[in-house]
Amino acid sequence: MRDSKRVVLYISIMVLSIFIIGCGKGNEIKEDAKEEQIKKSFAKTLDMYPIKNLEDLYDKEGYRDGEFKKGDKGMWTIYTDFAKSNRPGVLDNEGMVLNLDRNTRTAKGYYFVDTIYDNHENSYSKNYRVEMKNNKIILLDKVEDQKLKERIENFKFFGQYADFKSLKSYNHGDVSINSNVPSYDAKFKMSNKDENVKQLRSRYNIPTDKAPILKMHIDGDLKGSSVGYKKLEIDFSKEENSELSIVDSLNFQPAKNKDDE
């Protein structure tokens, strides 16, 4: 009788163990599936990189939904910034945003220089208007600082030299999901041998040998949405309270009409 009870107890423990392991495996499969979906969602735009001539975007179709008015060819918005904290509590951030209207085949935007303090009291922000013609950035505002002027006129978006053809090789990411928004995040460890990392080190002052983290963020439907948003970040930060990263995004949305501004 005692032996039969032990057998029943043993079988119960085995069944429970299999159930727990099965649940764990199920969660792993779900996370792997979401990681793959996030990468596939990003691949729709990253497969276009490098976009050496930004004017090629005038002839590139993006994801369209009911937000687009009839006849609207849409607008590509490309963005790159470089953020660095040289002093505790202070973040210096420079970059450019450019809107390429496929209806008018014109590209306008601005270069920004921000100094952001934790207390926000002494924060500083300055925008310099730009346009693009013949794949060349043209500065529309007067800039006294010659070095800044050269940085603006010679600016290259990350998407102009980045190459993510090997995106599938980024594996075992840390995936997090907020179903309420919805939003999706995935983090992948990069290598200093990665060509994208080498490109960034050659273009920016990155005083650390630490291999960066690739962060992918999506707001909205994974399948695509004109009201959603995708952001790519390559984070070189050495510690939690320091900031050293490059942010990139390429999004397709309805073109803004004058009445909307």
From Swiss-Prot:
It holds the Pfam family DUF576. One of its GO terms (cellular component) is plasma membrane. Gene3D superfamilies: 2.50.20.40. The keyword Iron-sulfur does not apply. A lipid is attached at C23 (N-palmitoyl cysteine). It is found in: Cell membrane. Residues 1-22 form the signal peptide. A lipid is attached at C23 (S-diacylglycerol cysteine). It comes from the Bacteria. NCBIfam families: SA_tandem_lipo. This is Uncharacterized lipoprotein SA0400. The lineage of its organism: Bacteria, Bacillati, Bacillota, Bacilli, Bacillales.
